[in-house]
């Protein structure tokens, strides 16, 4: 925060605040540290914004999918992972409501088959993360993708997707659990 005081204008402080809020999903992600929260609170005071209102407006703007192509929505946060036996991709799409995410899921499902072929991966998962409910519905495609997901999170495999309550971080929650299950299958 001390370094941000020298930045000189509210815009730069709001930008730093936005980065922290986005990275920590409004402090709901397990990646959030006490330092993240204290720095964000200090930046909010300096930038003269109410942090809750600012975060809500920021996420609502970020989850406005109108005018975006399926490809733009899908690839805005997509990463490929490798194990000894397979390559798989995970996209994460966040919004403020399950309804928004359900609409996006309908749009994305047919595109996932194309992603498998274009990226030459075995499986693809999409985390549809509801920020306010602190949960992710996972939709998937590829051979054994649903079986692996269900086994990893001790959930029944469902073709329409699997709801994982409390799972919002791809890095700290989703990928380690999924990769552990894949390692057990080797």
Where in the sequence are the language-model features?
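Glycine-rich, mobile lid/loop segments that gate access to catalytic sites or pores
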Residues: 26
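C-terminal accessory domains and tails appended to enzymatic cores
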Residues: 39-186
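Amphipathic alpha-helical segments in well-ordered regions
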Residues: 19-20, 115
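Alpha-helical scaffolds flanking conserved acidic
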Residues: 12-19
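Single conserved hydrophobic/aromatic residue that forms the stacking wall/gate
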Residues: 1-7, 11
